[in-house]
Amino acid sequence: MLTLVLNCGSSSVKFALLDLSANLTLLSGLAERLGSTGAVATLSRGENRRSVPVPDGSYAGAFEVVRAELGALGVREQVRAVGHRVVHGGERFSAPALIDAKVMAAIRACVPLAPLHNPANIAGIEAAQEAFGQLPHVAVFDTAFHQTMPDVAFRYAVPESWYAQHGVRRYGFHGTSHAYVAAEAARMLGMPLDALNLVTAHLGNGCSVAAVQGGRSIDTSMGLTPLEGLIMGTRSGDVDPGLHEFMARQAGLSLTQVTAALNKESGLSGLSGGLGSDMRELEAAAGRGHTGARLAVAAFVYRLAKGVAGMAVALGHLDALVFTGGIGENSATIRAATLERLGVLGFRLDQQANAQAVRGQPGLISAAGSVPALVVNTNEELSIARQTRQVLAAQTGDQA
């Protein structure tokens, strides 16, 4: 069974074609700058990579490129389903869902909760249904994994009517990644997932930690939106809610302007004085003595360690810490500094193992006798493909 996985953003589409029976990715790619005349798709088959223009710079044009590539591979008729990443499923979805009119209506109803993401997801689904209309389409939600959080973790201390009438609560994100790496960590540790208490740290341009108890999320750092929690590439993470009114009064900024700044001009970029959000560049600049870069890296580690410790409190007992995402998988510096701060929880670093766990090399990075810390490569496309297959198997009884 070949499964096409799509992740539609406001100006991009990330795609992958997976053969689950052979555990292979046959095709992957990224269509960028959609909505402009310079839209281009980068296609990768193994080590071969090439770029092609996207007709009219639209989702439909991007999917025409994908269809053509499937034809060139001779596998168009073997594709059995399309799996879509959808950022926000609200309280409605605690599992992936076969997309029909009711599911689409429910995704639309979540737009106020994710105005930066769900509209693009919806537009991408609609264009994909036009391009691949004969295939079943499945929505896999970033928020679904965290629907097992107890109310003490997901409720905000705000008027009850805000929750009852408007759904104001903590939802969490990166759920597909947290669930995948938790299962992989259990496999690598040689222990059953349902017997483990894990903290998973997804560290990329967006960052979050989660407390995973027996394979179920019981807390996470992101909240109503992906803005809450850790310091991220351009997102602030936790700030005083009074900041909006303060900046409106002091600088004449609107709510929209403050929110945009917190999402796009803050985090590592803001702390470094606008140097950038790429951790590799910030680490290098910090090594050269750049004051802003040093502050950004140190604050990132400090807030990450506090986040991990908070998740450990939720678990009561911590069996292992998992690093994943672009930073988590590749920055030995960030991992080492974080574990040094977490010595109070029993972590000790194996410096050689940590140095080797880069560029796609997963493994244990903690010293003997330490609480285990390990690097696990996330694979959200594979997870979405597997969940898509599970939905179809439940619908048809087909285990292929």
From Swiss-Prot:
Enzyme Commission identifier(s): 2.7.2.1
GO biological process: acetate metabolic process; acetyl-CoA biosynthetic process
Active-site residues, as the UniProt record annotates them: 142 (proton donor/acceptor)
GO cellular component: cytosol
Stored PROSITE patterns: ACETATE_KINASE_1, ACETATE_KINASE_2
Cofactor stoichiometry and binding remark: Mg(2+). Can also accept Mn(2+).
Family annotation (SUPFAM superfamilies): Actin-like ATPase domain (SSF53067)
Keyword annotations of the record: ATP-binding, Cytoplasm, Kinase, Magnesium, Metal-binding, Nucleotide-binding, Transferase
Any GO MF annotation of the entry: acetate kinase activity
Amino-acid positions noted as binding ATP in the UniProt annotation, renumbered to this chain: 14, 202-206, 278-280, 326-330
Name of this protein: Acetate kinase
Provenance organism: Deinococcus deserti (strain DSM 17065 / CIP 109153 / LMG 22923 / VCD115)
Higher taxonomy: Bacteria, Thermotogati, Deinococcota, Deinococci, Deinococcales
